[in-house]
Amino acid sequence: MSTQLRHCGLDFGTSNTTLAVARGNELSLLLPLEDGKPTIPSTIFFDFDTDRTLYGRAALAEYISGTDGRMMRSLKSILGSSLAEEKVRIKKRILSYLMIIGGFVGELKARAEVEIGERVLVSDAQG
């Protein structure tokens, strides 16, 4: 296994999200994040019956099936606005939108680690 670090690039879109990895000069590769597909809907569903948090297509399916809960989409539009630090009630929990978005990014990180078989480190653009 190479000791050279892989680089991950996250495209957090309003509707869909993708994640690509590359090492050195190799071509970047979009990872299959859900059901073998390289895109995952930027959607979160909080299931009130089971207290599970679902992401992507699974989140949409639970919402469409009528499961009691709360669906959130288009969270990217909150970033950079005064709403980012605002808090929202999800059943008995109070969460900021940044915490909710952080949960989505954390889920993507976990899926990427499973897919590439390596730990993914998160940092800002400056390292």
Where are these regions (language model features)?
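Gly/Thr-rich phosphate-binding beta-strand-loop-beta motif of the actin/hexokinase/Hsp70
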Residues: 2-30
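Phosphate-binding loop and its immediate beta->loop->alpha context
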Residues: 25-127
